Amino acid sequence: MTKAYENRMLLQALVLAAVLCTTHAEGTAKAPLKHSVATGFCSFSKAAKQAANKLAQTLDAVKATLNQNRKAHLQNLLVAVKRPTEQIAALILGQYANTQAASGLSDLGKWAPDETKTIGQALYTSGRLDGFIDVLDGHRSENSGQNKNCIANDGDGTTKAFDFDALCGPTEVAKAGNEPGDLKSSDRNGFWWHRRAAASGGNNHCVIFDDLNTAYSTKTAATDFLAGLIKVHQTTGLTAATAIAAQKSTNKILKDIDANWPKVQQAYTTAAGRSPTTEQEYKDLLKDESSRQKLRAAAQTVNNWKPADKPANMDDYLKQVFKIDANVNSAYVTAMKEISMDVPTKDGETQKKELFEMSEEDLEAALAVEIRRLSSENAKLTTEVKQLRRNQGKQATEDTCNKMKGETACNNKPFCTYNATETDENKKCKFNETKASKSGVSVAQAQTGGTQTTTDKCKDKKKDDCKSPDCKWEGETCKDSSFILNKQFALSVVSAAFAALLF
């Protein structure tokens, strides 16, 4: 081996060592940032913008679900009030809507402080990254052949196109899309090469990464960008930063994202369904056993069956309640279509609308009208029933006094008075309400003082004697007057309607 050959081999080794040192070591002032590092930063930034848009999309969907379920509940509440015969069906559908609404609130509740703050932190980090990259991208010569850049080709520092909007996402976040990647993976993959951030090749012209100690007379400490993701030595430019494996849990702009991102991904998932609000949607829900199965839990809640009382065939029960015929037409849906009301609009004006035309605000206004109407009817019917019962009690007490024979026997009763001028011997002894009141005897007490109840009084009467207002002949027997019974039934209907409003 000649001396010249040995010298040549030594020179090659020194050149190789110099190349390796240039490739693997930082330490050249003005060296540009690697294109791959800038691209990795941008991939995270774009995903963060998409994550924010996904949050907006998710919350909008949850809001729409809550509104639709609320509308469905109001629709069926109005049916329960307006059509008492359809009340159970209406309450089942109303309960179904309530269940879906509760699920929607649960979806909303997933966005607790950790989740929402993580999205906020991701957007903040995106802004920091965008600002840093945008400044570097702007620091380049307009003559690409000069290879004067702050973002350059990794291997040789030459000019390489950098499409900021395509890589980092548009400046207007809303236009970035809404299918975020995994930010937990992005912070590992996007920042993987940040530690060795400087491009090699000797095209060192980025004034941002200049010898700061010389440029500013005195700069004794390194400068951190992005809370330490990028580190610039005070004299030798871009230098090695702490590895992302450590920074992801310590770097202030990343650590909360890495820790909480799994919670965010879970919060993106929604479970709530939407209750029907249109005629066709109700028909679709009731059309077959598979779809009607969704109503079984609501039917159980409304009826509160004990295990022994639960219908053997739940679908048969539902078909009966919703009055579904052989052609899968539901009389309940038909009843909904037939409901129309004068809905308050503004300044004392009203507008007639059908149920399926009503908005949520219309339904609320219609229910307010019904509540006032029911309250008025309830008060009126309660008064009428009390008065009817009082009148019947007086009549029964009058009959009790009429049956008393002789002045002494009559006057001895604390609620009777003998009238000697009465020509009818059967009516000389009469009920005296004033005497009864002074004696502390109520009509009810007087009525039980030897007379029959209204029911007993009618029960034994012959057909010719069975007359209103107290009695009515039905079939072969004399029964209580249907008038008061009808009033009592009407009162029970109103009470049931009120109960439906509270369900």
From Swiss-Prot:
Any one Gene Ontology biological process term? symbiont-mediated evasion of host immune response
Q: What residues bear carbohydrate chains?
A: 419, 432
Question: Which ranges are cleaved off as propeptide?
Answer: 481-503
- Bilayer disposition of the protein: Lipid-anchor; GPI-anchor
Keyword Electron transport on entry: no
Q: What is the protein's major site of localization? A: membrane
Entry keywords, A to Z: Cell membrane, Disulfide bond, Glycoprotein, GPI-anchor, Lipoprotein, Membrane, Signal, Trypanosomiasis
Q: Where in the cell is it found?
A: Cell membrane
The record's disulfide annotation reads 42-168, 150-206
Question: Where does the record locate the signal sequence feature?
Answer: 1-29
Its protein name is Variant surface glycoprotein ILTAT 1.3
Q: Which organism is this entry from?
A: Trypanosoma brucei brucei
